[in-house]
Curated annotation (Swiss-Prot):
Membrane-spanning ranges: none
Subunit structure and binding partners: Heterotetramer of two alpha and two beta subunits.
Protein name as catalogued: Succinate--CoA ligase [ADP-forming] subunit beta
Organism annotation: Pseudomonas aeruginosa (strain UCBPP-PA14)
Reaction it catalyzes: succinate + ATP + CoA = succinyl-CoA + ADP + phosphate; GTP + succinate + CoA = succinyl-CoA + GDP + phosphate
EC class (word): ligase
Domain spans labelled ATP-grasp: 9-244
Length: 388
């Protein structure tokens, strides 16, 4: 689950980290009022969406009057912001963050993730702030500094000082950076985060450090023990199909292809997507119905896949272990009848009751293409999607 920038900065402030004075507003009038509350003669207004690249898309602007702040809010509230990280429809803007203006001398990067290989929280810092950190990691990996946090003792001040020295900070900046580093590490652990970024972490003209941005992603598996963060969830930023899938305990991720995929098991689902790509197709989704799939969940999975107008064909790839193939077959038949499927459906069944499942499908009288292997299934569904 992601948080908006203004929500992330609220958490930063609770941990004593330096952030800009600002207000998240819902109306153009509130945007103008926020300028009065903040004071000064210049403000930064930011559209709040769960996506990067807002600045290049016109979603971040420096304004020099209350009227301009109000006009910006009128321009974006209720509209969708399209960035390089969104799909063609963009993300809806329901809040605008109005902040005081910051005089920047230098931009740094500071972030943290859970490193699966070491099973530790790893902090990353770089002098290349304000840019895409993935690009820095690819082009100049030597510019990214890393520190691993011991889960037994947590982040230590000496680790913060070491990073500060390597970033070229001096004097009070070292103390400030260490304070920010330790605070972010505590926040990361307290709230079960999966990712945290301050990009950029800036050195102001007066030499002080300042958190100019906040990106926070929470481990969804830990939300049951984070009621405060659950309350911060903005459902408007979720893909409607993904939200519906979550209610049925289905793992669904929307993609941009035209071949719908329904598979049991995350590994098999990824393998299925790979082989579809290998044969020239483009998956429209990742969908794992799980090991404990029921007929009802399979029916809902089918509905979710077919709710995507881009889907030209559907591939169902089931390996029956815990899940019986005949039950999956009944779910497919039920969904096809209920939804009124108008696209080709290719089914590959293997394992528990696979022969019975194939028989159920064959006797259904529906136009379902049976595949003999995974390769055959991929080839057939790619042809079907192309109308061949």
């Amino acid at each position: 689950m992601n948080l908006h920038e203004y929500q992330g900065k609220q958490l930063f402030a609770e941990y004593g980290l330096p952030v800009s004075k600002g207000f998240a507003v819902d109306t153009p009038e509130e945007a103008a009022e926020a300028c009065d509350k903040i004071g000064g003669s210049e403000w930064v207004v930011k559209a709040q969406v769960h996506a990067g690249g807002r600045g290049k898309a016109g979603g971040v602007k420096l304004v020099k009057s209350k009227e301009d702040a109000k006009a910006f809010a009128q321009q974006w509230l209720g509209k969708n912001l399209v960035t390089y990280q969104t799909d063609a429809n963009g993300q809806p803007v329901s809040k605008i963050l109005v902040e005081s203006c910051t005089d920047i001398d230098k931009e740094l990067y500071l972030g943290a993730v859970v490193d699966r290989s070491s099973r530790r929280i790893v902090f990353m810092a770089s002098t290349e702030g304000g840019v895409d950190i993935e690009k820095v990691a690819h082009d100049t990996p030597e510019k990214i500094l890393k520190v691993t946090i011991d889960p037994l003792v947590g982040a230590q001040p000496y680790q913060g000082r070491e990073l500060a020295f390597q970033l070229g900070l001096k004097g009070d900046q070292i103390k400030q950076f260490t304070h920010i580093f330790v605070g972010l590490a505590k926040l990361f652990q307290d709230y079960d985060l999966a990712l945290l970024e301050v990009n950029p972490l800036v050195i102001k003209k007066d030499g002080n450090l300042h958190c100019l941005d906040a990106k926070i992603n929470i481990d969804s598996n830990a939300l049951y023990r984070q009621p405060k963060l659950r309350a911060m969830h903005d459902p408007s930023q979720d893909d409607a199909r993904e939200a519906h899938a979550q209610k049925w305990e289905l793992n669904y991720v929307a993609l941009e292809g035209n071949i719908g995929c329904m598979v049991n098991g995350a590994g098999l689902a990824m393998g299925t997507m790979d082989i579809v790509n290998l044969h020239g197709g483009k998956p429209a989704n990742f969908l794992d119905v799980g090991g404990g799939a029921t007929k009802e969940r399979v029916t809902e999975a089918f509905k979710i896949i077919l709710s995507d107008s881009n889907v030209k064909a559907v591939l169902v790839n089931i390996f029956g272990g815990i899940v019986r193939c005949d039950m999956i077959a009944e779910g497919i038949i039920g969904a096809v009848k209920e939804v009124g499927v108008k696209v080709p459906v290719v089914v590959r069944l293997e394992g528990n009751n696979a022969e019975l499942g194939a028989k159920v499908l064959a006797e259904s009288g529906l136009n379902i293409i049976a595949a003999t292997s995974l390769t055959d299934a991929a080839q057939q569904v790619v042809k079907a999607a192309e109308g061949k």
